[in-house]
Curated annotation (Swiss-Prot):
Protein name: Large ribosomal subunit protein bL21
Coiled coil: none
Keyword Transit peptide set for record: no
Function, in words: This protein binds to 23S rRNA in the presence of protein L20.
GO CC annotation terms, alphabetical: cytoplasm; ribonucleoprotein complex; ribosome
Pfam families, alphabetized: Ribosomal_L21p (PF00829)
Organism expressing this protein natively: Rhizobium leguminosarum bv. trifolii (strain WSM2304)
Subunit structure: Part of the 50S ribosomal subunit. Contacts protein L20.
GO molecular function: rRNA binding; structural constituent of ribosome
InterPro entries hit by this protein: bL21-like, bL21-like_sf, Ribosomal_bL21
Keywords, in A-Z order: Ribonucleoprotein, Ribosomal protein, RNA-binding, rRNA-binding
Domain of life: Bacteria
Amino acid sequence: MFAVIKTGGKQYRVAANDVLTIEKLEATAGDSIEFTEVLVIGEGADAAIGAPFVTGASVKAEVVEQNRGKKVIAFKKRRRQNSKRSRGHRQHHTVVRITDIVAAK
């Protein structure tokens, strides 16, 4: 069984025991979280498609760790003006493991 969940402005296709990196959530390692914004749930022809969400469906996950992504460098240079600027940014991420997919009853 799979589900498509929405979190952090993105959509993810998940199944049981999947490990995925999502935008930062306020939780610590070992916490249990639940995603209620489920867009699609099921398997094959038995898939239920929400409009926009499937009512009563949820996906349970466990937080594995909080980490940061690779550094992204934003570099600006203005030609012939001896002017340049370099800025770095590292996005915060949460790594979660999907534990259970609960279908609507």
